[in-house]
UniProtKB/Swiss-Prot annotation:
Keywords: Copper, Metal-binding, Metal-thiolate cluster. GO terms for molecular function: copper ion binding. Pfam families: Metallothi_Euk2. Belongs to the metallothionein superfamily. Type 13 family. This is Metallothionein-like protein CRS5. InterPro entries: Crs5 (IPR035715). It comes from Saccharomyces cerevisiae (strain ATCC 204508 / S288c). Critical role in copper (specific) homeostasis and detoxification. May protect by directly chelating and sequestering copper ions. GO terms for biological process: response to metal ion. The keyword Cell wall biogenesis/degradation does not apply.
Length: 69
């Protein structure tokens, strides 16, 4: 089974995959895809706010600004 990286939208059961997540393509006949978050994705933990995987995150004045990929 090939592991692929999901696009931000549109790949691998839209409602199941997040931008940059690794996707195990088990999506057949309405099944949900099994997606795992990328371990190397930047998280804005120091700001106390979580960003979606593979977003660019900048912290200013304890606020987390996340940009979609």
């Amino acid at each position: 089974m090939t592991v692929k990286i999901c696009d931000c939208e549109g790949e691998c059961c839209k409602d199941s995959c997040h931008c940059g997540s690794t996707c195990l393509p088990s999506c057949s006949g309405g099944e949900k895809c099994k997606c795992d978050h990328s371990t190397g994705s930047p998280q804005c933990k120091s700001c106390g706010e979580k960003c979606k995987c593979e977003t660019t995150c900048t912290c200013e004045k304890s606020k987390c600004n996340c940009e979609k990929c």
